[in-house]
Amino acid sequence: MNKELQPKVVFLMGPTASGKTALALELAEKHNCEIISVDSALIYRGMDIGSAKPSAEELARGPHRLIDIRDPSESYSAADFRADALSEIEQIISMGKTPLLVGGTMMYFKALLEGLSPLPSADEVIRADIQAEADANGWEALHDQLREIDPVSAERIHPNDPQRLSRALEVYRISGKSLTELTMTKSAPLPYNVVQFAIAPRERKVLHELIGQRFRIMLEQGFIDEVAQLKARDDLHLDLPSMRCVGYRQCWQYLDGEFDHDTMVEKAIAATRQLAKRQLTWLRSWPELNWLESGAEGNLVTLMRHCR
């Protein structure tokens, strides 16, 4: 089918603190579109301040789908996101509206755009067997096994990387196919006319300043109390994906007494800047991308022109 004849879907990507939400809300008010959040932190309930979740006022202006859909104790994968996002996109299109996907979790955007490899889910029994073999014979022996069944993965995975080594062996024992073979197979790409935008300040120092300002505002809004409430739960810990979100980990460690308040602020801001750097690295290699400068006057007009 001709791409131009397919229903239109708009991506608005960008690093943290670049102004994505504000621009998306403007577009939602001016254009017949609905917002889908593409953010691995916004999915969690009770993580509002540190994730910069849209306020009640902002959500009234432009409701966001796929926020507050998981408890922080639960996991959520790129495959989960793809399935949920496809369902939301179909609903929005059936209403005669344009889906506007907004966020900074590039892995989610990539999974949605390109599809995912059909890897099997984890099998705790097989995983335990692999661990028992490693305890008995060492990871080097298991790496030799991997080299026999999947030399490409064995070249890429170091014997001292037990998590990835175990997963490669687990995939083979479950499916009978190597990790290399399965990752060459992708699910169907997104069947829509996707128009992609990225927004960021022209100068990195501006983004760094925005990140610092925003984190200090979060502290004024009660971020430490928010983390303290999460920390008080018996079922949350720092190994969970939710608690690995930038800011939350550093604040948790501060509450544990690992460092003082000023150090926590420095570490949280530095971690957020590193996240922004990774996001920009993804975006610089992203194909078919239209760039917008944060705060530029013509951004809304440009978006509306492409959304017609």
Curated annotation (Swiss-Prot):
InterPro entries: Dimethylallyltransferase, IPT, P-loop_NTPase
Assigned keywords, A-Z: ATP-binding, Magnesium, Nucleotide-binding, Transferase, tRNA processing
Residue sites binding substrate per the record: 16-21
Site (Interaction with substrate tRNA): 105, 127
Role noted for this protein: Catalyzes the transfer of a dimethylallyl group onto the adenine at position 37 in tRNAs that read codons beginning with uridine, leading to the formation of N6-(dimethylallyl)adenosine (i(6)A).
Record text on subunit structure and interactions: Monomer.
Family stated for the protein in its record: Belongs to the IPP transferase family.
Full protein name: tRNA dimethylallyltransferase
